[in-house]
Amino acid sequence: RRPMPPIDPDTLGEQYGMFLMLFGIQPKNDGVHLCGCPLYHTAVLNFSTYSLHMGHTVVIMGKWDPEEHLRLSEKYKVTHSHLVPTQFHRLLALPDETRSRYDLSSYSQMIHGAAPCPNDTKRKMLEWWGPCVWEYYAASEGGGTVIPPSEWHDKPGSVGRPWPISQIRILDDEQQPCAPNDVGTVYIKMGDIEFEDHGDKGTTEKAWNDGFYTVGD
């Protein structure tokens, strides 16, 4: 059994909430998080539990449906949610009459990640939801980037800058740094974090380079 961390639970809860501050989400503040993805995924679980640590209400959908997401958003005056691009596509596919039926003005953060989001899809979501659509790039192993809607308008397609204590390198096939605009493999470093793939030390070693790891992107 993994030992409990040697830290007071109240202190740990406050630290957990700091992650949401990367997206401008603040403690208390009548926050309401709508969970529309499976809680077994690290990101989904983190956004939900960290919201609880910040004193927010969390609304959990038993099964995600695009119109039901809109209905619950209006009913509970949801302030932030976390979705993936496929769900954006399904929301945008709703008839205009359905989309205009619900008040989404309570939202301050609609956060998305987990997969590439086409620029056209992102623009349409920003036109519909307003300047609340935040994007991040990350991995369950730790570390990543974030970009607010204001910066995305200037650099469409970007996933932003590294989080605090997170570093990013783009390396070529020879494990050398790529020049700007060159295609390479993403390597991430998050503080002093270390891990090993279960039962596969060889794969783990291939994923690491000078303290940075890659998931193959």
Language-model features and meaning:
Residues V32-L34, I111, V186-Y187:
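Short, well-ordered beta-strand segments
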Residues W64-D65, T86, P116:
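Short beta->alpha linker loops
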Residues P177-N181, Y187-D217:
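Conserved ATP-binding/catalytic segment of the ANL
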